[in-house]
Amino acid sequence: MPNVSEYHRDVVLVWEHSTQWKSEMNHSSDFWDALASHHSAIENNYLDLPSLRRIIHDIHQPVLVVGAGQGLIVEALQKKGLHAEGVDLSAEMIRYAQKRRGLTLVRADARAIPFRDGAYETIIYATGVVDFIADDAQIQMILNEARRIVTQSGRIFVAFYRISASMEDLLIRLGLLRNNVMAFKEVLGLYGMNLVQTIAWAAGKADAGYLHATGLLLRSWAFSTTKEKLTALSMQRIFRKVADADSLINAAPEGQPYRNEGEIRNLFTRLATPISKLEATASCYIVEI
C-alpha cells in the first residue's frame, strides 16, 4: 500500500486481527462488491466532482477519503496537487481503483480506521458511508474515529446523498419512502423492468389506474435532475447487461436512510455535534463539523 506507507510509515492494520467486526465488514460490503464491475457508469454521482469543487478551497493535505470507492475523489484531489489517500469497505471497489486508476486504497471499516491519531488535516466521508447508516450509535463511532485521526485544527466533511423534490414526492406516493427510510431493494428492482412493467407496478403501488400511474411517472421524470435521469438510464443499461440481476438485488439492503436537510440537522443535534457549515449541492449535502 504505497500511497499510505510513503506518508505514514507507522500505520498499523489492526483491523486484520479483529475477527468480530471483520465479519460484519464482509457482510456490509456485499452490495458494493456486486456492483463494482459496473460502478464506473454511475460513480460520478451524489458526492460528485461538481460537489467537490464547492469545498475544494477548504480542503488541506493530507486528505483521507472514507468510502473512496474506485478512487474518483482521491484521484481528483491528487490532480489538484493534494496528498490524498482513501479507504473503502469493499475489496472489489479497491481492486478496481487499482485497475482503473493505479490507486492503492486501504480496506477498512469506518468505525476503526487503521491510522495513527492526528494523521490527517482533512477527512471526507463520501456518500454511501454515514448517510447509509440508520443507527445513531454507529454514526457516533464513525465520527469519533474521524476526530481521532484528524489534527486538532483539521476539518471533517460528511456527505449525504440528495434526491430531487419530484423524486422524493414520487417515492412517497408509491410507498417507497416512509419515515425517512427508502425501500432500496425494491427501488433497485425497478431498473430491471421495462416501461409497461413499470407502469403496471406503479399502478398497483399507488392503487390507481394505468393512466394515473403513467402521469405520476412522467411528471417525476420531467422534473428530475439531469443527473438523476442519466443515473436511471445507466442503471437500466447495467441491469440489461448483468448476467444475474437477482444476485445484485439480493446483495442490496432492504432499506436505507434518506435524510433531507432538516433530518440531517436533527441527526447532528441528537449526536451533540455542532454543524460548522452545511452545503446543499444539486446531488448531495456536505456537512462540515
Predicted segments, located by residue:
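Conserved class I S-adenosyl-L-methionine
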Residues: 3-60, 72, 157-199, 226
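Class I SAM-dependent methyltransferase core
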Residues: 65
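Class I SAM-dependent methyltransferase SAM/SAH-binding core
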Residues: 70-112
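A short acidic, Gly/Pro-enriched loop at the edge of an enzyme's catalytic core
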Residues: 111-123
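Short, glycine-/aromatic-enriched active-site segment of Class I SAM-dependent methyltransferases
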Residues: 128, 171-176, 233-257
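A short glycine-rich, Lys/Arg-flanked "PGG" loop and its adjoining helix->strand segment in the class I
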Residues: 140-152
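Short alpha-helix
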Residues: 253-271
